[in-house]
Amino acid sequence: IGMGYVAEKHLKAIKQTGGNLIASLDLRDGVGILDSYFPNCSHFTEFERFDRFCSGKDIDYTVVCSPNYLHSSHCFFGLRIGSDVICEKPLVLHERNLDNLIVMQNLTHHRIWNILQLRLGDTVEQIRQTIQTTNSDNVFLEYVVSRGSWYDYSWKGNEEKSGGPLFNIGIHLFDLLLHLFGRKWEIRRWRGDHRYQDGTLFIGGFDVGISLDISSDIAPIRRLSIGNEDFDLSKGFTNLHAKSYEKILTSNGFGIESVRPAIALCESLRNY
């Protein structure tokens, strides 16, 4: 469900792990990217026809790549038709909605799996070792990506639909930080707007400075600094959707509770 930018990563992962995509849904009818992966996939632009096609079929997984504010309802759909669900980040925009999804999981006996691909990066173990041996308690995460004026007019620029940069850009970074440094956090200071977020968190005994910027015209920066050591988050983090699918196919993926800490943190920062 959803054939935007991130969908191709899922198409590639489905192909690499031996899967077959039988149906897709997007408001656009120009989805030529399917030709490179699943040319026989039935494409729909209307949810009702997509629903009718999927109902009663033996579908193993529903993949959710729609705009953030629709993730929860599309996860409900996937569970309702009797499939597991693979959902892009963020699973929800409000922590309370996680509990509703858990209830639906229990009723249907199917699972929701989350794409938390940064946890699977080749560099993660090296970062973890640095955390354990460093004499410094200072950490800085800088993430800069350029987004043109189109961003403000798309659903991504609408905070009600995307959750703002905290959920749309920052969620996978916050998840990685909590995965590495610990799930308990405290907000020391925070400020931001629809294109810039900046502040300091206290996580696992470390003062973690964070700067998220999607308004800059400079080259992208994806850097995590621990003391004097820098880690480029652009390297060692490739083909991770396929790795995520491999874990999901063996029931070793990341479930609903895995995303709760980062969802709670982003929601708290948004309301700070």
What are these regions (language model features)?
Residues 211-246:
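Interdomain hinge/lid region at the active-site interface
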Residues 152-216, 257-264:
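Rossmann-like dinucleotide-binding domain that binds NAD(P)(H)
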Residues 92-149:
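A contiguous active-site-proximal alpha/beta segment in oxidoreductase catalytic domains
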Residues 1-39:
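N-terminal Rossmann-like dinucleotide-binding module
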Residues 19, 36, 49-52, 61-64, ...:
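C-terminal helix-rich "cap/oligomerization" subdomain common to oxidoreductases
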Residues 24, 62-63, 141:
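Receiver (REC) domain switch-region micro-motif
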Residues 10, 38-102:
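Beta-loop-alpha module in the N-terminal Rossmann-like domain of NAD(P)-dependent dehydrogenases
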